[in-house]
Amino acid sequence: MNDTYLSRFWGSDYQVILNVADIGRSLPPFWVDIATADQSRRLEAFRALVRQVFIHMPETSSLLLERTTDAYLVKVRDDVALVADRQADDQVLSYRGFAPTDKSMFGGSVGAFYKALDGFCDFHSMGGLLPEREIRPIGKDGNEYWTEPSSKLFETVKSKDYFHIFNSGGKGQGYISLHSTVVDDPEGLLLWVDDDEPMTNMDFWDLFDNWTSIAMEDN
């Protein structure tokens, strides 16, 4: 378990859940199975979750199945997070996602993902799919685009139904068309704070599966 990351980001206000009775709230069955002191059983349950939840992110799924060294649930105040550790040289790196809610703002396959796992971000850079609580409409998400060509495109799309859903942990920020999730043809958009060319009308899952897996490979 990555005590370094847990204490750095949550201080002392957290509890690793090693018993189902300590969860204290309703969770999907594939989450509940991770609440055990047996590491091999935790990993087995986590792999089952990955195969079910990351069905549209095959590259990310493959890396998680191959490289995850431990997975566990953490209670943080009234919330529950899933943490997945992996070894990178001489340090342990972790991703985290939050317990899902019954409803999602998204439809289709994106909504199905968020009803199973509320976001999936790198603990250190916060790069990855944001939890819904942090998702904001484009133009209200705190990101500013001053450099062309992203600045020009931003002026065109800021009045549309794009929402900031992916943080690259660097210069790029990812968006999704809310309407496209309702018809289950999710459309991704990537804007940059430098002069790189924006990526428009992208297949959402292909785009962010690729970005997530590249980030995991680089680490």
Task: Describe the predicted segments one by one.
Residues M1-G172:
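A surface-exposed partner-binding patch
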Residues E155-K160, F166-N219:
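A recognition module on extended beta-rich or small alphabeta surfaces enriched in W/G with H and D/E
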